[in-house]
């Protein structure tokens, strides 16, 4: 439909010009107007995705996460946009050192992509490398908790284990 061409043209116009050169006030005003227009409802995923890219490039990570999730909730069926949202969220969590969460988002990305594509192989390799990081991070966290218990005084250690036993009994 012609509306689809208009939306994609407006969305990609900012991508091509580069978000760094964009006047943020005018950009946000324009995008909010596009988001509020009822005729654009079938394209909310693309609009939220591009708004998330804008926030991501401008280091507003919290806003970027919200917009990526809004794009995912729009559910319009554009597989590549869905995969791109998951991949970008995975990269955000990876950069925040939240490797387990990043792994989950990479898994969701792989589900959306065709297995014979270059992007699929790249993300699959990245995900496999992340498995070792997640494994060693779990070991380090467990060892840190053991060391912290060992560093407690006898009184604190007894109180800690009594509290833990009560917690297990409740379950």
Predicted regions mapped to residue ranges:
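Acidic, polar-rich low-complexity tracts and alpha-helical solenoid repeat scaffolds
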Residues: 1-171
